[in-house]
Amino acid sequence: LILGALSAFGPLAIDFYLPGFPAMAQAFATDEKHIQLTLAVYFLGLSIGQLVYGPIADRFGRRVPLLVGVGLFTAASFACAFAPSLDWLIGARFVQALGGCAGMVLSRAIVSDKCDGVGSAKVFSQLMLVMGLAPILAPMLGGLLVNLYGWQAIFIVLTCFSALAALAVALGLPESLPANVPRQPLSGALRQYGRLLKDREYLGHALTGGIAMAGMFAYIAGSPFVFIQLYGVP
């Protein structure tokens, strides 16, 4: 249950607040392009954070980086809810992404630490179910919150959700990295990243996946304005 909640941080923080785009644009007296920056910056934070948390978790264990990440997500969600300006909101979204990707990365690492091949496959399938349901349910719940309480309510709910997740991690999730496993130096991760960047086959697959995802998220970023403002979907 805890790992499922942690793995849902990324999808929730993307799809949950999409229905609030038009209201946010009105609140900050700006256009849709500037509001969409809050989504682009979030993806930038996710990209950077995933490169960082893996090596740190291999060096220092899973629990402490996870608590730090969830704490960052909680604080940034609170800052988003009470952002006095669009620049503040964009900055808070970047920090929110840096914190949120800890749950996405380290929940998988914890499963690998605790389970064998068959057990890992079973748990990963359950985590994928959570990550698949979150983008489906989140926009509906987000739209309901925006209509009832305003766009700030979305980030208040994310603050409460992540605070409960942090408490659950602190009280119910022990360190999973075995003590007898050699701690990997951070320099080793940099060398591995360097080798990947020289691998043409890897770069080809990564570029293909990135282009495909770019098209999907271009639709996601523009769809709230189309459905709400053009078609009048409440």
Stretches with model-predicted labels:
Residues 15, 43-51, 135-136:
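Residue-level signature of mid-helix packing/kink "hotspots" within the transmembrane helices
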Residues 48-87:
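Conserved MFS/SLC helix-loop-helix module at the cytosolic interface between two early adjacent transmembrane helices
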Residues 87-93, 205:
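Short hydrophobic/alpha-helical segments at membrane-entry points of transmembrane helices
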Residues 176-206:
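Juxtamembrane intracellular "pre-TM" segments in multi-pass secondary transporters
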